[in-house]
């Protein structure tokens, strides 16, 4: 499914009946959230609000795109796959790139050449003239209030930029980092950059600040980027591969980049809107509270202030937005789809893993259920520790349930059956204190630091129990086949 940019993707969705245009005037203040939430819960289409209205009743100049990733199928489309199941192939590619195996022979080496050729042929293409710079606002012309920025929940402190793709670069680094961080609107040219300390953008900023304590730090924020680049920013791409290169691989065409007008950062040339600016030394502001993906309003905290010096955009740009709230929301749907990418990555490191599931009800990452082919006593605990430590995405996972491969991790009835019949609460529970936790998790005793629990719901091996272990009841296949043959005659 090849497409060039967000507009191309929108046209493809509309042609397939997967996008709905809303001509009725709708306010970004609460109303868009209400509509998008109802549509997402009904597994409905992406939405293009053509006439957003301001608080005074006048209209914004730009439409709002919402619920773009409201179904796993649309996430898969954005990643260039024709079904959610095909996302595992993307995971297999990432697993190979993360830890490539030496070829087993000449034939095996040649079989890998097409993949490697495809990957390296997708290096970004830098252009001089770009659609995203057709219109330029600078100086006093910069006015973030002219953008239809969504105010999602009644007790949110201010409008919030939600799908901003933040582009940064650390000192002495060639590769740029892409991250999605929410940004509170606090002034005509001011946003609060809420990035957690371990995230790529924050790390780049911290390194820069150590070497340049008095120098403004350049940042670019892309609004209305193509889906492949957005999804590349939230996928565990190996450090040897840039997100822009990975996006090209997903999209089936090289990512076109252009240098920002005011700094050396490169942004997608066909993006809708780009905010260029700096973070000044020691300029922070109190962020929040906001309703977030947990279903609660989060605590306030101080984060750096992003000063927007320039806004560039396409002719008639589209503003891309979303909301986060109690699952299901778009992040939860993204989690369901990206789950399929994670499975091959984990299996590469732990071949005994047969499936892995992040229940969307668990806020996409706070609980994981893993099935495995158990081979020895204590094996389940090894897998628990591996899942917590292997991918950065699972650093904040609070609960991991491990089951045998006869249990469907996506069926809660099966999982609860395993937990209640194969677990002893004392012997089979692993508890850890003072581990990294999402600072939005107000249940932890300290902000950013809390506990983890592992539940070993596997059958126990000698060494783990001295008792005779129960045998699973199974039907007689011959009797089942016989009853199948006469079932219609029974009239049941």
Curated annotation (Swiss-Prot):
Membrane-protein topology: Peripheral membrane protein
UniProt keyword annotations, A-Z: Cell membrane, Decarboxylase, Flavoprotein, FMN, Lyase, Manganese, Membrane, Metal-binding, Ubiquinone biosynthesis
Compartmental location: Cell membrane
Keyword check for Cell membrane: yes
Quaternary structure and interacting proteins, as annotated: Homohexamer.
GO CC annotation: cytosol; plasma membrane
Lineage, broadest ranks: Bacteria, Pseudomonadati, Pseudomonadota, Betaproteobacteria, Neisseriales
Cofactor note: Binds 1 prenylated FMN per subunit.
Chain sites annotated for binding prenylated FMN: 180-182, 194-196, 199-200
Active site: 292
Molecular function GO terms recorded: 3-octaprenyl-4-hydroxybenzoate carboxy-lyase activity; metal ion binding
Reported cofactor(s): prenylated FMN; Mn(2+)
Catalytic activity: a 4-hydroxy-3-(all-trans-polyprenyl)benzoate + H(+) = a 2-(all-trans-polyprenyl)phenol + CO2
Pfam families, per the entry: UbiD, UbiD_C, UbiD_N
Protein purpose: Catalyzes the decarboxylation of 3-octaprenyl-4-hydroxy benzoate to 2-octaprenylphenol, an intermediate step in ubiquinone biosynthesis.
Group of enzyme by EC: lyase
Broad class of the protein's primary localization: membrane
UniProt binding sites for Mn(2+): 177, 243
Protein name according to UniProt: 3-octaprenyl-4-hydroxybenzoate carboxy-lyase
Protein family: Belongs to the UbiD family.
């Amino acid at each position: 499914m090849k497409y060039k940019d967000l507009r191309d993707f929108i046209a493809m969705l509309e042609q397939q009946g997967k996008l709905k245009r809303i001509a009725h005037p709708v306010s970004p203040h609460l109303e868009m959230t209400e509509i998008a939430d109802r549509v997402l819960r009904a597994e409905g289409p992406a939405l293009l609000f053509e006439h957003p209205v301001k608080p005074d009743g006048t209209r914004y100049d730009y439409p709002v795109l919402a619920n773009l990733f409201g179904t796993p199928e649309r996430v898969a489309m954005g990643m260039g796959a024709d079904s959610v199941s095909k996302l595992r192939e993307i995971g297999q590619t990432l697993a190979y790139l993360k830890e490539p195996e030496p070829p087993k022979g000449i034939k095996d080496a040649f079989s890998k050449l097409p993949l490697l050729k495809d990957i390296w042929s997708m290096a970004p293409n830098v252009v001089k003239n770009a659609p995203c710079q057709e219109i330029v606002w600078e100086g006093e012309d910069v006015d973030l209030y002219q953008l239809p920025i969504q105010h999602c929940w009644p007790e949110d402190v201010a409008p919030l930029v939600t799908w901003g793709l933040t582009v940064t670069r650390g000192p002495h680094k060639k590769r740029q980092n892409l991250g999605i961080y929410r940004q509170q609107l606090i002034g005509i040219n001011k946003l609060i950059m809420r990035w957690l300390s371990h995230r790529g953008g924050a790390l780049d900023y911290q390194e820069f600040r150590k070497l340049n304590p008095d120098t403004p730090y350049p940042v670019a924020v892309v609004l209305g980027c193509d889906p492949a680049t957005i999804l590349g920013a939230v996928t565990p791409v190996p450090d040897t591969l840039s997100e822009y290169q990975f996006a090209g691989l997903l999209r089936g065409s090289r990512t076109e980049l252009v240098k920002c007008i005011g700094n050396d950062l490169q942004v997608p040339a066909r993006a809708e809107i780009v905010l260029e600016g700096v973070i000044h030394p020691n300029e922070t502001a109190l962020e929040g509270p906001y309703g977030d993906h947990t279903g609660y309003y989060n605590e306030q905290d101080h984060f750096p202030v992003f000063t927007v010096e320039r806004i560039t955009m396409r002719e008639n740009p589209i503003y891309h937005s979303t909301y986060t709230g109690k699952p299901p929301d778009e992040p939860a749907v993204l989690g369901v789809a990206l789950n399929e990418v994670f499975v091959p990555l984990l299996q590469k490191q732990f071949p005994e893993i047969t499936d892995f599931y992040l229940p969307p009800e668990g806020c996409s990452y706070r609980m994981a259920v893993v099935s495995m082919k158990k081979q020895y006593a204590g094996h389940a605990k090894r897998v628990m520790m591996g899942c917590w430590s292997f991918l950065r995405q699972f650093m904040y996972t609070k609960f991991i349930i491990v089951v045998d491969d006869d249990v469907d991790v996506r069926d809660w009835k099966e999982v609860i059956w395993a937990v209640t019949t194969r677990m002893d609460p004392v012997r089979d529970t692993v508890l850890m204190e003072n581990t990294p936790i999402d600072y939005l998790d107000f249940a932890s005793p300290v902000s950013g630091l809390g506990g983890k629990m592992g539940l070993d719901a596997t059958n126990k091996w000698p060494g783990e129990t001295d008792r005779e272990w129960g045998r699973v009841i199974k039907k007689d296949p011959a009797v089942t086949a016989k009853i199948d043959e006469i079932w219609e005659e029974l009239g049941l």
